[in-house]
UniProtKB/Swiss-Prot annotation:
Biological source species: Homo sapiens (Human)
Protein name from the UniProt record: Protein FRG2
Domain of life: Eukaryota
Residues covered by region (Disordered): 1-129, 251-278
Sequence ranges of Polar residues compositional bias: 11-31, 78-92, 120-129
Ranges in coiled-coil conformation: none
Length: 278
């Protein structure tokens, strides 16, 4: 029995050394003899020590593939994380840039629309204002040209009328004749009133009123008549412009009771009572 156990222990130790497996725990067999336990323990210790030394040497000489694989995976993971971080940051920056560019484009489109409308409206207003200004300038030029042409035609007509001896316009003739007719009518009325005083004497009140009216009326008549005569004599003298009768210098037509107006004569003399009243 003892020899069989020893052979089995040696066989196990040889198997452990050949397979390079980790050392197993010490197996103790309880047998009757104490002498047989001691050589078994000593042999087991020596075999275990030899196998452990060999295993440690092999572990030191040969690299562990699992550790290398784990280190490689860690390095790859670190590299992947280090590469992914800048990639993710660049991706985020690109996204931000795209968002900012889209916002800017939207703002530009939203802001350019009213600017374009304003520019179009300003262009339209400027065009309309320039068109109006050009039309006004054209109108003024046309009016100036027309006035110049009319002035030229007027000068030419005047020269022609003077050269051919044509009569003056009808407006001047009617103006002069109307002024002369009015002055003569007022003069006739005053002469008739003064003549009626002889046949039917007037009262004191009527005479005072007549004397008050006589001064301004005579002055107006004289001015009108003188204006008519001046207008007649300023222009070239013609038959219709020459007045019929002119008052003498230094005397008025109303002061001459004997000759108040051409065609009218006062034959009756003033009585003494009337003279006293006057």
């Amino acid at each position: 029995m003892g020899k069989g156990n020893e052979d089995s222990d040696l066989h196990c130790s040889s198997i452990q050394c050949s397979t390079d497996q980790p050392p197993f725990q010490q197996i103790s067999f309880t047998e009757k003899g104490s002498d047989e336990k001691k050589p078994f323990k000593e042999k087991g210790k020596t075999a275990f020590s030899h196998s452990s030394e060999k295993h440690i040497q092999r572990q030191g000489s040969e690299p562990n593939p699992n550790k290398e694989n784990s280190e490689e995976t860690k390095l790859k993971a670190g590299n992947s994380t280090a590469g992914s971080e800048p990639e993710s940051s660049s991706y985020r920056e690109n996204c931000r840039k795209r968002k900012m560019s889209s916002k800017d484009s939207c703002q530009d489109t939203a802001g350019n629309c009213p600017e374009k409308e304003c520019s179009l409206s300003l262009n339209k207003k400027s065009r309309s204002s320039t068109a109006v200004h050009n039309s006004e300038i054209q109108e003024t030029c046309d009016a100036h040209h027309r006035g110049h042409s009319r002035a030229c035609t007027g000068h030419s007509k005047r020269h022609r009328s003077r050269a051919l001896g044509v009569q003056t316009p009808s407006i001047r003739k009617s103006l002069v004749t109307s002024v002369r007719a009015m002055s003569e009518a007022v003069y006739q009325d005053l002469a008739q009133v003064w003549a009626q005083q002889i046949h039917s004497p007037l009262t004191c009140e009527q005479l005072t009123l007549l004397t008050r009216l006589r001064g301004p009326l005579c002055a107006q008549v004289q001015t009108l008549y003188s204006m008519a005569t001046q207008a007649a004599y300023v222009f070239p003298a013609e038959s219709w412009l020459v007045p019929a009768t002119l008052p003498g210098p230094g005397e008025s037509a109303l002061d001459r009771e004997a000759h108040p107006f051409p065609g009218q004569e006062i034959t009756e003399t003033v009585s003494g009572s009337d003279e006293a009243k006057l």
